[in-house]
Amino acid sequence: ASDVYKRQKPKIVVIGSCNTDMVVKAGRLPVPGETVLGGTFYMNPGGKGANQAIAAARLGAEVTLISKIGYDLFGLQALEIYRSEKINTEFIFTDQKSPSGVALISVDSYGENSIIVAPGASRSLSTEDIDKAKSKLEEADIILMQLEVPIETVEYAATIAKSYGKKVILNPAPASVLSNSFLSCVHTILPNRIEAEMLSGIKVIDEESAWRAAKAIGEKGIENVVITLGKD
């Protein structure tokens, strides 16, 4: 029975960023030029790609993460964490010239945060790296992507995935201008209201405008459009 279960595990490839989140909690966030004495400090794996990969692996999928790290302590620690989460790290490449990505996050007592991301090696994930992982794209059931790695790399991977008849799920964040040729390779897209407005040209202010924006985005050749509205 266990063999049957293993065969039924969905194979998911995630193409995206991996960062180390460095988080400090404080009573309030500092204003420019101010120093605030904080409380708790901790480090977590972060980056939209790594977050998706960890979540999918914990839900029982067979996950491969395609990403890039620097040859440094943060990168090596990230690899250990991904392996402990049963993620295939075979295609996490190392950039000898760039540091691993980090995010500096300050959080106040209400949960409001301010974040600065230094993407580092994530920004050098290339089309050549995707070529090295083509066999995994061909085996995959689903390919997850976001836009914290170069858009030309993601678009190249989406084109290959479509040629293999694979379902591409795109989280179009950070908000960016995307070509119709790229969007036509996407099966499911998950924009927030700002990203939906950028993709559709329709300002999303309520449920009715969200429906209109979703319809306009769907007309670009995307089968499923899911617009997230935050706390609404």
Please provide the spans of the model-predicted regions.
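Short gly/ser/thr-rich secondary-structure transition/capping motifs
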Residues: 86, 123-128, 168-175
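Alpha-helical segments flanking ligand/cofactor-binding loops in enzyme cores
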Residues: 54, 79-80, 155, 159, ...
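Conserved phosphate/ATP/ADP-binding segment of small-molecule kinases
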Residues: 158-232
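Beta-strand->loop->alpha-helix junctions that form or flank phosphate-binding loops
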Residues: 15, 40, 66-71, 89-100, ...
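Active-site-proximal loop->helix
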Residues: 73-85, 103-107, 111, 129
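Glycine-rich phosphate/adenosyl-contacting loop at the front of the ribokinase-like
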Residues: 6-68, 73-87
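Short, small-residue-biased leader/transition segments that mark boundaries at the very start
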Residues: 1-5
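Conserved phosphate-binding/catalytic loop of the ribokinase/pfkB sugar-kinase fold
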Residues: 90-95, 105-142, 147
